[in-house]
């Protein structure tokens, strides 16, 4: 398909020398999957994700995960609105077409779980109210190589993700 070739060529103008990875990420995007990019710092993980977002024209958000990132930062929260006397949903970063989840290994297992649940179910639930994620919805996760993404109970997160079939991992 010529349109697909053109898209890949535009991305490869920014992401040089990683044609195979770019093609695999594109396959995941087209299939509605998610991608984990695991590599040492400074190798273009964020640049790759942003190139995809720009070329595809998708609404994009980036979350730089830290140890104090909480689930509500990602999925959203309800706020009491004095004027109406009710609660209003304030969407989190996940309400986008392409989410760059940068340095996922730096955040708590609780926050990782909230993100993974949304990735699998394609929706978020806040205060008993369910909100669908936009379509298309793709998460590009980045992690430092050798970060050992491990849940608090010692279960290796990558094995869980692969078993769920919600992403492919590229290094």
Model-derived segments and spans:
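Canonical AAA+ ATPase core
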Residues: 81-86, 103-111, 119-171
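Walker B catalytic acidic pair
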Residues: 39, 102-103, 114
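Pre-Walker A (pre-P-loop) alpha-helix and adjacent loop at the N terminus of AAA/AAA+ ATPase modules
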Residues: 1-43
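Helical mechanochemical/support elements of P-loop NTPase systems and associated helical scaffolds
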Residues: 3, 7, 18-21, 44, ...
């Amino acid at each position: 398909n010529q349109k697909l070739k053109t898209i890949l060529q535009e991305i490869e103008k920014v992401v040089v020398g990683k044609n195979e990875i770019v093609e695999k990420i594109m396959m995941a995007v087209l299939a509605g999957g998610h991608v984990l990019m695991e590599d040492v710092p400074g190798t273009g993980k964020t640049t790759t994700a942003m190139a995809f977002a720009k070329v595809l024209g998708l609404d994009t958000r980036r979350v730089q995960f830290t140890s104090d990132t909480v689930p509500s930062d990602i999925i959203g929260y309800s706020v009491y609105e004095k004027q109406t006397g009710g609660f209003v949903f304030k969407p989190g970063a996940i309400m986008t077409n392409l989410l760059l989840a940068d340095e996922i290994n730096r955040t708590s297992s609780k926050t990782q779980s909230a993100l993974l649940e949304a990735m699998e179910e394609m929706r978020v639930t806040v205060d008993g109210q369910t909100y669908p994620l936009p379509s298309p919805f793709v998460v590009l996760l980045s992690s430092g190589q050798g970060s050992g993404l491990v849940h608090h109970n010692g279960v290796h997160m990558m094995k869980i993700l692969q078993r769920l079939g919600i992403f492919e991992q590229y290094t």
